[in-house]
């Protein structure tokens, strides 16, 4: 969609929340960490809610998003002999995933019966790297939709 907007005077917005849901399923689902002790896999994108827009004003393309993300994890303990204890489910949420967030400002809430510290230590850095790519991918995918025709 190319918009007629002389001199880029008007704000042009595009709702990208549906795209963001697909993005997380395509790019974050099955994110994995594995070492000699653990295998941690993101098994489902449970919820992507909030706002996600790409906008243009005065020729500059920006993205504005404020979302809550919820994911499910599977954790396998490789050294555990007891089959009932060698794997368990966990969840991880990002209560505020926002456009002006710095890398060290990400908050990850982990729900698990066991091994929260290990999930935070090993899996969160892998997930964070993927989440940090979102903003550039969002703009790259939608900038052309909000820029005016010349």
Which role fits each region the language model picked out?
Residues 1-23, 27, 31-150:
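Long protein-protein interaction modules used by eukaryotic assembly/scaffold proteins
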């Amino acid at each position: 969609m190319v918009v007629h907007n002389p001199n880029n005077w008007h704000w042009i917005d595009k709702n990208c929340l549906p795209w963001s849901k697909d993005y997380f399923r395509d790019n974050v689902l099955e994110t994995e960490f594995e070492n000699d002790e653990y295998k941690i896999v993101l098994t489902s994108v449970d919820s992507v809610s909030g706002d996600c827009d790409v906008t243009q004003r005065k020729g500059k393309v920006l993205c504005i998003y404020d979302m809550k993300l919820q994911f499910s994890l599977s954790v396998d303990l490789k050294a555990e002999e007891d089959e009932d204890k060698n794997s368990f489910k966990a969840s991880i949420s990002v209560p505020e995933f926002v456009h002006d967030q710095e890398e060290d400002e990400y908050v990850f809430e982990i729900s698990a019966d066991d091994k929260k510290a290990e999930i935070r230590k090993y899996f969160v850095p892998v997930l964070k790297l993927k989440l940090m790519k979102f903003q550039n991918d969002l703009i790259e995918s939608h900038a052309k939709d909000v820029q005016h025709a010349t």
